[in-house]
Protein backbone atom coordinates (compact mmCIF):
# COMPACT_ATOMS: atom_id res chain seq x y z
CA UNK A 1 0.00 0.00 0.00
CA UNK A 2 2.84 2.38 0.95
CA UNK A 3 4.66 1.55 -2.30
CA UNK A 4 1.52 2.27 -4.34
CA UNK A 5 1.05 5.62 -2.62
CA UNK A 6 4.67 6.63 -3.20
CA UNK A 7 4.47 5.57 -6.84
CA UNK A 8 1.30 7.58 -7.33
CA UNK A 9 2.87 10.68 -5.79
CA UNK A 10 5.97 10.31 -7.96
CA UNK A 11 3.89 9.83 -11.10
CA UNK A 12 1.79 12.89 -10.28
CA UNK A 13 4.92 14.95 -9.67
CA UNK A 14 6.47 13.66 -12.88
CA UNK A 15 3.43 14.57 -14.97
CA UNK A 16 3.13 18.02 -13.40
CA UNK A 17 6.81 18.65 -14.03
CA UNK A 18 6.27 18.18 -17.74
CA UNK A 19 2.94 20.03 -17.92
CA UNK A 20 3.17 23.23 -19.92
CA UNK A 21 1.59 26.33 -18.45
CA UNK A 22 1.62 29.21 -20.93
CA UNK A 23 1.38 32.89 -19.98
CA UNK A 24 -2.12 34.34 -19.87
CA UNK A 25 -3.02 37.97 -20.41
CA UNK A 26 -3.36 40.36 -17.51
CA UNK A 27 -3.80 44.12 -17.52
CA UNK A 28 -1.07 46.65 -16.77
CA UNK A 29 -0.57 50.36 -17.12
CA UNK A 30 1.44 51.41 -20.18
CA UNK A 31 4.24 52.80 -18.00
CA UNK A 32 4.73 49.40 -16.35
CA UNK A 33 5.80 47.79 -19.62
CA UNK A 34 7.86 50.52 -21.22
CA UNK A 35 5.38 52.94 -22.77
CA UNK A 36 5.24 56.67 -22.26
CA UNK A 37 1.60 57.03 -21.19
CA UNK A 38 1.39 60.66 -22.25
CA UNK A 39 2.56 59.84 -25.78
CA UNK A 40 0.21 56.87 -26.01
CA UNK A 41 -2.67 59.05 -24.82
CA UNK A 42 -2.20 61.33 -27.83
CA UNK A 43 -3.44 58.45 -29.98
CA UNK A 44 -6.86 58.94 -28.41
CA UNK A 45 -7.30 62.41 -29.88
CA UNK A 46 -5.94 61.41 -33.27
CA UNK A 47 -8.36 58.48 -33.62
CA UNK A 48 -11.27 60.62 -32.42
CA UNK A 49 -10.43 63.11 -35.15
CA UNK A 50 -10.74 60.27 -37.68
CA UNK A 51 -14.14 59.33 -36.25
CA UNK A 52 -15.25 62.96 -36.46
CA UNK A 53 -14.10 63.00 -40.10
CA UNK A 54 -16.33 60.03 -40.94
CA UNK A 55 -14.52 56.79 -40.06
CA UNK A 56 -17.29 54.59 -38.60
CA UNK A 57 -15.52 52.93 -35.65
CA UNK A 58 -12.19 51.64 -34.42
CA UNK A 59 -11.63 49.08 -31.68
CA UNK A 60 -8.02 48.88 -30.56
CA UNK A 61 -6.15 46.57 -28.19
CA UNK A 62 -2.41 46.54 -27.50
CA UNK A 63 -0.45 43.72 -25.83
CA UNK A 64 3.05 44.12 -24.42
CA UNK A 65 4.95 41.48 -22.42
CA UNK A 66 1.81 39.38 -21.74
CA UNK A 67 -0.17 42.43 -20.58
CA UNK A 68 -3.09 44.29 -22.12
CA UNK A 69 -1.98 47.91 -21.87
CA UNK A 70 -4.62 49.58 -24.03
CA UNK A 71 -8.15 48.57 -24.94
CA UNK A 72 -10.58 51.17 -26.21
CA UNK A 73 -13.41 51.72 -28.69
CA UNK A 74 -14.16 54.83 -30.72
CA UNK A 75 -17.09 55.64 -32.98
CA UNK A 76 -20.23 53.78 -33.94
CA UNK A 77 -21.09 50.15 -34.49
CA UNK A 78 -24.04 51.34 -36.57
CA UNK A 79 -24.62 54.90 -37.73
CA UNK A 80 -26.49 54.35 -41.02
CA UNK A 81 -29.67 52.61 -42.09
CA UNK A 82 -29.22 52.55 -45.82
CA UNK A 83 -28.21 56.08 -46.80
CA UNK A 84 -29.90 57.60 -43.76
CA UNK A 85 -27.81 58.72 -40.81
CA UNK A 86 -29.42 57.42 -37.63
CA UNK A 87 -30.68 60.01 -35.17
CA UNK A 88 -29.35 57.79 -32.38
CA UNK A 89 -26.42 55.76 -33.74
CA UNK A 90 -25.21 52.74 -31.78
CA UNK A 91 -21.86 53.35 -30.16
CA UNK A 92 -19.09 50.79 -30.46
CA UNK A 93 -17.87 49.30 -27.18
CA UNK A 94 -14.89 47.12 -26.35
CA UNK A 95 -17.29 44.15 -26.53
CA UNK A 96 -18.51 44.92 -30.05
CA UNK A 97 -17.97 42.04 -32.47
CA UNK A 98 -16.59 42.71 -35.95
CA UNK A 99 -16.53 40.94 -39.29
CA UNK A 100 -12.86 39.93 -39.49
CA UNK A 101 -12.91 39.45 -43.29
CA UNK A 102 -9.54 37.97 -44.35
CA UNK A 103 -8.24 37.71 -40.80
CA UNK A 104 -10.47 34.62 -40.90
CA UNK A 105 -7.72 33.05 -42.98
CA UNK A 106 -5.33 33.20 -40.02
CA UNK A 107 -7.46 32.76 -36.93
CA UNK A 108 -9.72 30.03 -38.29
CA UNK A 109 -8.04 28.25 -41.20
CA UNK A 110 -4.38 28.74 -40.30
CA UNK A 111 -4.97 27.95 -36.63
CA UNK A 112 -6.76 24.76 -37.69
CA UNK A 113 -3.95 23.79 -40.07
CA UNK A 114 -1.24 24.60 -37.53
CA UNK A 115 -3.01 22.35 -35.03
CA UNK A 116 -3.42 19.54 -37.56
CA UNK A 117 0.23 19.81 -38.66
CA UNK A 118 1.39 19.65 -35.04
CA UNK A 119 -0.79 16.59 -34.44
CA UNK A 120 0.69 14.87 -37.50
CA UNK A 121 -2.65 14.68 -39.30
CA UNK A 122 -1.43 16.64 -42.31
CA UNK A 123 1.86 17.61 -43.94
CA UNK A 124 2.18 20.88 -45.83
CA UNK A 125 3.95 18.98 -48.61
CA UNK A 126 0.90 16.75 -49.17
CA UNK A 127 -0.84 17.10 -52.51
CA UNK A 128 -4.15 18.95 -52.45
CA UNK A 129 -5.65 16.06 -54.40
CA UNK A 130 -5.05 13.78 -51.40
CA UNK A 131 -7.85 15.59 -49.57
CA UNK A 132 -10.03 16.88 -52.42
CA UNK A 133 -10.93 14.10 -54.88
CA UNK A 134 -11.08 15.27 -58.48
CA UNK A 135 -8.72 18.17 -57.91
CA UNK A 136 -6.85 18.03 -61.21
CA UNK A 137 -6.36 19.76 -64.53
CA UNK A 138 -9.44 20.02 -66.70
CA UNK A 139 -9.55 19.32 -70.43
CA UNK A 140 -8.81 22.53 -72.23
CA UNK A 141 -6.92 24.16 -69.35
CA UNK A 142 -4.21 26.31 -70.91
CA UNK A 143 -2.06 26.25 -67.78
CA UNK A 144 -1.48 22.85 -66.24
CA UNK A 145 -0.34 21.79 -62.80
CA UNK A 146 -3.34 21.41 -60.46
CA UNK A 147 -2.69 17.73 -59.80
CA UNK A 148 0.83 18.59 -58.60
CA UNK A 149 -0.18 21.42 -56.28
CA UNK A 150 0.79 20.95 -52.64
CA UNK A 151 -0.75 22.50 -49.56
CA UNK A 152 2.39 24.59 -49.11
CA UNK A 153 1.83 26.10 -52.58
CA UNK A 154 -1.67 27.13 -51.56
CA UNK A 155 -0.43 28.60 -48.26
CA UNK A 156 2.27 30.59 -50.05
CA UNK A 157 -0.28 31.93 -52.58
CA UNK A 158 1.80 30.61 -55.49
CA UNK A 159 -0.72 28.02 -56.73
CA UNK A 160 -1.84 29.88 -59.85
CA UNK A 161 -5.40 30.73 -58.82
CA UNK A 162 -6.99 34.12 -59.57
CA UNK A 163 -7.48 36.53 -56.69
CA UNK A 164 -11.28 36.69 -56.87
CA UNK A 165 -13.37 34.71 -59.39
CA UNK A 166 -16.60 36.22 -57.94
CA UNK A 167 -18.43 32.89 -57.96
CA UNK A 168 -21.80 34.31 -56.75
CA UNK A 169 -21.99 36.97 -59.47
CA UNK A 170 -23.15 35.25 -62.64
CA UNK A 171 -22.38 38.36 -64.68
CA UNK A 172 -18.68 37.93 -63.85
CA UNK A 173 -18.29 34.24 -63.01
CA UNK A 174 -20.08 32.87 -66.06
CA UNK A 175 -19.80 29.07 -66.06
CA UNK A 176 -18.16 29.17 -62.62
CA UNK A 177 -21.28 30.71 -61.04
CA UNK A 178 -22.26 29.19 -57.70
CA UNK A 179 -24.46 30.14 -54.79
CA UNK A 180 -24.28 26.86 -52.89
CA UNK A 181 -21.39 25.28 -51.00
CA UNK A 182 -21.44 21.90 -52.75
CA UNK A 183 -21.49 23.54 -56.18
CA UNK A 184 -18.76 25.96 -55.14
CA UNK A 185 -16.30 23.14 -54.49
CA UNK A 186 -16.94 21.82 -57.98
CA UNK A 187 -16.50 25.30 -59.46
CA UNK A 188 -13.20 25.71 -57.60
CA UNK A 189 -11.98 22.47 -59.18
CA UNK A 190 -12.93 23.90 -62.57
CA UNK A 191 -11.38 27.32 -61.99
CA UNK A 192 -8.55 27.75 -64.53
CA UNK A 193 -5.11 28.64 -63.27
CA UNK A 194 -4.10 32.20 -64.15
CA UNK A 195 -0.33 31.73 -64.04
CA UNK A 196 2.17 28.90 -63.85
CA UNK A 197 2.28 27.61 -60.26
CA UNK A 198 5.38 28.74 -58.41
CA UNK A 199 6.20 31.55 -60.84
CA UNK A 200 4.88 34.37 -58.61
CA UNK A 201 2.79 35.23 -55.55
CA UNK A 202 -0.81 36.29 -56.13
CA UNK A 203 -2.88 36.69 -52.97
CA UNK A 204 -6.04 34.67 -53.60
CA UNK A 205 -9.26 34.01 -51.70
CA UNK A 206 -9.59 30.78 -53.67
CA UNK A 207 -6.48 29.42 -51.96
CA UNK A 208 -8.11 29.71 -48.56
CA UNK A 209 -11.45 28.41 -49.73
CA UNK A 210 -9.52 25.30 -50.77
CA UNK A 211 -7.72 25.12 -47.42
CA UNK A 212 -11.05 25.36 -45.60
CA UNK A 213 -12.33 22.37 -47.56
CA UNK A 214 -9.12 20.49 -46.69
CA UNK A 215 -9.64 21.11 -42.96
CA UNK A 216 -13.18 19.76 -43.30
CA UNK A 217 -11.92 16.71 -45.19
CA UNK A 218 -9.37 15.83 -42.49
CA UNK A 219 -11.59 16.49 -39.48
CA UNK A 220 -14.88 15.25 -40.97
CA UNK A 221 -16.45 18.37 -39.45
CA UNK A 222 -17.66 21.70 -40.82
CA UNK A 223 -14.93 24.31 -40.45
CA UNK A 224 -16.91 26.43 -38.00
CA UNK A 225 -17.69 23.49 -35.71
CA UNK A 226 -14.08 22.33 -35.72
CA UNK A 227 -12.52 25.66 -34.78
CA UNK A 228 -15.27 26.64 -32.36
CA UNK A 229 -15.12 23.35 -30.42
CA UNK A 230 -11.41 22.45 -30.56
CA UNK A 231 -9.79 25.91 -30.53
CA UNK A 232 -12.05 28.72 -29.34
CA UNK A 233 -13.97 26.88 -26.62
CA UNK A 234 -10.86 25.42 -24.90
CA UNK A 235 -9.34 28.93 -24.92
CA UNK A 236 -12.46 30.32 -23.25
CA UNK A 237 -13.38 32.58 -26.17
CA UNK A 238 -16.99 33.74 -26.01
CA UNK A 239 -17.36 36.00 -29.04
CA UNK A 240 -15.49 34.28 -31.88
CA UNK A 241 -17.89 32.54 -34.25
CA UNK A 242 -19.08 32.17 -37.81
CA UNK A 243 -22.70 33.18 -38.56
CA UNK A 244 -23.20 34.94 -35.20
CA UNK A 245 -26.92 35.59 -35.71
CA UNK A 246 -27.44 31.82 -35.90
CA UNK A 247 -25.54 31.27 -32.65
CA UNK A 248 -27.31 33.42 -30.12
CA UNK A 249 -25.90 36.86 -30.89
CA UNK A 250 -28.03 39.83 -31.88
CA UNK A 251 -27.32 42.68 -34.33
CA UNK A 252 -26.70 45.34 -31.62
CA UNK A 253 -23.72 43.27 -30.42
CA UNK A 254 -22.10 43.49 -33.87
CA UNK A 255 -20.68 46.29 -36.02
CA UNK A 256 -22.60 46.92 -39.23
CA UNK A 257 -20.86 47.07 -42.61
CA UNK A 258 -22.04 48.05 -46.09
CA UNK A 259 -25.00 50.41 -46.30
CA UNK A 260 -26.83 48.81 -49.25
CA UNK A 261 -25.96 45.13 -49.03
CA UNK A 262 -23.33 44.19 -51.58
CA UNK A 263 -24.56 46.64 -54.22
CA UNK A 264 -21.87 49.30 -53.60
CA UNK A 265 -24.57 51.95 -53.32
CA UNK A 266 -26.61 50.50 -56.14
CA UNK A 267 -24.13 49.89 -58.97
CA UNK A 268 -23.66 46.11 -58.61
CA UNK A 269 -26.46 43.63 -59.24
CA UNK A 270 -26.72 39.85 -59.38
CA UNK A 271 -29.37 37.27 -58.36
CA UNK A 272 -30.17 37.19 -54.63
CA UNK A 273 -27.89 40.14 -53.83
CA UNK A 274 -28.53 41.70 -50.43
CA UNK A 275 -29.65 45.34 -50.51
CA UNK A 276 -30.24 46.11 -46.83
CA UNK A 277 -27.55 47.40 -44.46
CA UNK A 278 -25.40 44.42 -43.50
CA UNK A 279 -25.55 43.83 -39.76
CA UNK A 280 -24.40 40.52 -38.30
CA UNK A 281 -23.90 38.78 -41.65
CA UNK A 282 -20.50 38.35 -43.26
CA UNK A 283 -19.89 41.04 -45.86
CA UNK A 284 -17.76 38.93 -48.21
CA UNK A 285 -19.80 37.83 -51.22
CA UNK A 286 -18.16 34.44 -51.77
CA UNK A 287 -18.41 33.58 -48.08
CA UNK A 288 -22.09 34.54 -47.84
CA UNK A 289 -23.67 33.48 -51.13
CA UNK A 290 -21.33 30.69 -52.23
CA UNK A 291 -20.40 29.17 -48.85
CA UNK A 292 -23.33 29.82 -46.51
CA UNK A 293 -21.35 32.17 -44.28
CA UNK A 294 -18.59 29.70 -43.41
CA UNK A 295 -15.46 29.70 -45.54
CA UNK A 296 -11.73 29.32 -45.11
CA UNK A 297 -11.15 32.83 -46.43
CA UNK A 298 -13.82 34.90 -44.64
CA UNK A 299 -16.80 34.68 -42.31
CA UNK A 300 -15.35 34.81 -38.79
CA UNK A 301 -16.53 37.43 -36.27
CA UNK A 302 -14.75 38.36 -33.05
CA UNK A 303 -13.99 41.12 -30.57
CA UNK A 304 -10.65 42.58 -29.49
CA UNK A 305 -10.33 40.55 -26.28
CA UNK A 306 -10.78 37.21 -28.03
CA UNK A 307 -8.38 38.30 -30.75
CA UNK A 308 -5.85 39.25 -28.07
CA UNK A 309 -5.95 35.70 -26.71
CA UNK A 310 -5.39 34.24 -30.18
CA UNK A 311 -2.45 36.57 -30.82
CA UNK A 312 -1.01 35.67 -27.41
CA UNK A 313 -1.18 32.00 -28.41
CA UNK A 314 1.19 32.84 -31.24
CA UNK A 315 3.49 34.89 -28.99
CA UNK A 316 3.50 32.00 -26.49
CA UNK A 317 4.59 29.52 -29.13
CA UNK A 318 1.30 27.66 -29.47
CA UNK A 319 -0.64 27.69 -26.22
CA UNK A 320 -2.46 29.70 -23.59
CA UNK A 321 -2.78 28.79 -19.91
CA UNK A 322 -3.06 25.00 -19.79
CA UNK A 323 -4.24 24.72 -23.42
CA UNK A 324 -1.72 23.65 -26.05
CA UNK A 325 -2.81 23.89 -29.68
CA UNK A 326 0.58 23.50 -31.39
CA UNK A 327 4.24 24.12 -30.59
CA UNK A 328 6.87 26.78 -31.23
CA UNK A 329 8.32 24.81 -34.14
CA UNK A 330 4.94 24.97 -35.87
CA UNK A 331 4.74 28.72 -35.25
CA UNK A 332 8.23 29.14 -36.73
CA UNK A 333 7.34 26.96 -39.72
CA UNK A 334 4.22 28.96 -40.57
CA UNK A 335 5.71 32.43 -40.02
CA UNK A 336 9.00 31.79 -41.85
CA UNK A 337 9.45 34.01 -44.91
CA UNK A 338 8.93 32.51 -48.34
CA UNK A 339 12.21 32.29 -50.30
CA UNK A 340 10.54 33.96 -53.28
CA UNK A 341 8.80 36.81 -51.44
CA UNK A 342 9.81 37.92 -47.96
CA UNK A 343 6.33 39.31 -47.25
CA UNK A 344 4.67 35.88 -47.32
CA UNK A 345 4.87 33.14 -44.72
CA UNK A 346 2.58 30.13 -44.78
CA UNK A 347 -0.55 32.24 -44.98
CA UNK A 348 0.76 34.88 -42.63
CA UNK A 349 1.90 38.21 -44.07
CA UNK A 350 5.38 39.08 -42.85
CA UNK A 351 7.07 42.47 -42.43
CA UNK A 352 9.70 41.46 -44.96
CA UNK A 353 10.26 44.71 -46.84
CA UNK A 354 9.03 48.28 -47.27
CA UNK A 355 5.93 47.19 -49.19
CA UNK A 356 4.42 46.18 -45.84
CA UNK A 357 4.83 49.64 -44.30
CA UNK A 358 1.14 50.58 -44.86
CA UNK A 359 0.26 47.48 -42.84
CA UNK A 360 2.90 47.23 -40.10
CA UNK A 361 4.33 50.76 -40.12
CA UNK A 362 8.04 51.58 -40.09
CA UNK A 363 8.81 50.82 -36.44
CA UNK A 364 7.74 47.18 -36.03
CA UNK A 365 10.51 44.59 -36.15
CA UNK A 366 11.21 42.77 -39.46
CA UNK A 367 10.00 39.58 -37.75
CA UNK A 368 6.51 41.01 -37.27
CA UNK A 369 3.69 39.05 -38.91
CA UNK A 370 -0.08 39.23 -39.06
CA UNK A 371 -2.86 39.91 -41.54
CA UNK A 372 -5.44 42.42 -42.68
CA UNK A 373 -9.14 42.21 -43.47
CA UNK A 374 -11.08 44.14 -46.12
CA UNK A 375 -13.65 45.37 -43.60
CA UNK A 376 -10.94 47.30 -41.72
CA UNK A 377 -9.16 44.78 -39.50
CA UNK A 378 -5.48 44.31 -38.69
CA UNK A 379 -3.53 41.93 -36.51
CA UNK A 380 0.16 42.59 -35.94
CA UNK A 381 2.31 40.20 -33.88
CA UNK A 382 5.88 41.22 -33.06
CA UNK A 383 7.87 38.43 -31.36
CA UNK A 384 11.00 40.60 -31.02
CA UNK A 385 9.23 43.28 -28.98
CA UNK A 386 6.85 40.69 -27.49
CA UNK A 387 4.01 42.90 -28.60
CA UNK A 388 0.76 42.55 -30.52
CA UNK A 389 -1.83 44.96 -31.86
CA UNK A 390 -5.37 44.30 -33.06
CA UNK A 391 -7.43 46.92 -34.87
CA UNK A 392 -11.04 46.08 -35.63
CA UNK A 393 -13.12 48.41 -37.75
CA UNK A 394 -16.16 48.54 -40.02
CA UNK A 395 -14.74 50.65 -42.83
CA UNK A 396 -17.47 49.75 -45.40
CA UNK A 397 -20.10 51.30 -43.10
CA UNK A 398 -19.91 54.56 -45.01
CA UNK A 399 -20.99 55.71 -48.48
CA UNK A 400 -19.02 54.68 -51.56
CA UNK A 401 -16.89 57.65 -52.60
CA UNK A 402 -17.68 57.43 -56.33
CA UNK A 403 -19.61 54.26 -57.23
CA UNK A 404 -19.28 54.68 -61.00
CA UNK A 405 -15.51 55.27 -60.90
CA UNK A 406 -14.52 52.65 -58.30
CA UNK A 407 -17.30 50.92 -56.35
CA UNK A 408 -14.80 49.45 -53.87
CA UNK A 409 -13.56 52.74 -52.42
CA UNK A 410 -15.60 53.95 -49.47
CA UNK A 411 -15.45 57.49 -48.08
CA UNK A 412 -13.88 56.17 -44.88
CA UNK A 413 -11.25 54.37 -46.93
CA UNK A 414 -9.84 57.74 -48.00
CA UNK A 415 -9.02 58.72 -44.41
CA UNK A 416 -5.57 58.15 -42.85
CA UNK A 417 -7.05 55.65 -40.36
CA UNK A 418 -7.65 53.27 -43.27
CA UNK A 419 -3.86 52.86 -43.47
CA UNK A 420 -3.17 50.75 -40.40
CA UNK A 421 0.51 51.68 -40.30
CA UNK A 422 -0.45 55.20 -39.19
CA UNK A 423 -1.95 53.81 -36.00
CA UNK A 424 0.74 51.17 -35.52
CA UNK A 425 3.56 53.72 -35.75
CA UNK A 426 1.89 55.95 -33.18
CA UNK A 427 1.78 53.00 -30.79
CA UNK A 428 5.42 52.01 -31.33
CA UNK A 429 6.42 55.66 -31.16
CA UNK A 430 5.05 55.73 -27.61
CA UNK A 431 7.62 53.22 -26.37
CA UNK A 432 10.29 54.74 -24.14
Swiss-Prot record:
It is a single-pass membrane protein. Its EC number is 3.4.16.4. It catalyses: Preferential cleavage: (Ac)2-L-Lys-D-Ala-|-D-Ala. Also transpeptidation of peptidyl-alanyl moieties that are N-acyl substituents of D-alanine. InterPro entries: Beta-lactam-related, Beta-lactam/transpept-like, Diverse_Enzym_Activities, Pept_S12_YfeW/YbbE-like. One of its GO terms (biological process) is proteolysis. Keywords: Carboxypeptidase, Cell inner membrane, Cell membrane, Hydrolase, Membrane, Protease, Transmembrane, Transmembrane helix. Its main location: membrane. The chain crosses the membrane at residues 7-25. Pfam families: Beta-lactamase. Gene3D superfamilies: DD-peptidase/beta-lactamase superfamily. The keyword Hydrolase applies. One of its GO terms (cellular component) is plasma membrane. GO terms for molecular function: serine-type D-Ala-D-Ala carboxypeptidase activity. It is found in: Cell inner membrane. Belongs to the peptidase S12 family. YfeW subfamily. This is Putative D-alanyl-D-alanine carboxypeptidase. The lineage of its organism: Bacteria, Pseudomonadati, Pseudomonadota, Gammaproteobacteria, Enterobacterales.
Amino acid sequence: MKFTLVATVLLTFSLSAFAVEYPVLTTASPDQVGFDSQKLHRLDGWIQNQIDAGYPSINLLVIKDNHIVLQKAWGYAKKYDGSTLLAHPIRATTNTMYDLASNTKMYATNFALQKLVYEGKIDVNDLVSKYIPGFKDMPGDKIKGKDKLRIIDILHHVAGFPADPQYPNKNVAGKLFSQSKSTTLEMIKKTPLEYQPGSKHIYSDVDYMILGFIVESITAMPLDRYVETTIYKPLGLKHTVFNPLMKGFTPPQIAATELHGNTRDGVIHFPNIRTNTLWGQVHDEKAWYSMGGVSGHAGLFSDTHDMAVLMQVMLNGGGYGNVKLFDDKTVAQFTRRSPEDATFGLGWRVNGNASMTPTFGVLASPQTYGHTGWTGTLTSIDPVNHMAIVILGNRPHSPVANPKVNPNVFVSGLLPAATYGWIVDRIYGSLK
